[in-house]
Amino acid sequence: MTSGELANLAHLRRARDLMDRDYARPLDVPAMARAALMSPAHFSRQFRAAYGETPYGYLMTRRIERAKALLRRGDRSVTEVCLEVGCTSLGSFSARFTEVVGESPSAYRARDHRAGATVPACVAKAWTRPERTSRNGEATG
């Protein structure tokens, strides 16, 4: 790997860290590209090449991951969780949650999650990481 490629990855990591840290803030591709010191189009291409998904897809996966944790607690409504993780449309949030998780936010919230309550947080995070599913319910790569 060349020094230019390493510098490029460092810039992309800066944008990815921004998404991980500030997922609840309104973030768009131009803002993420600024964090990576790239044009929006170049940033989108480079991010997808490096991480295998679009910047927006990565951001939404982080939001869904956090939403799952909040829904497991059961003390917030789906609407409250939607807004807390940075989504502004309940319909879009529910559709994306269902696409990624394979069930609606309401169904996920209603499920019994006590079995995972004693699992260490580091294991639970990996265990509950959203995995995009196809329309027929199979996990996609």
Regions found by a protein language model. Give the residues of each.
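Alpha-helical bundle regulatory/interaction domains
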Residues: 1-42, 49-50, 54, 66-141
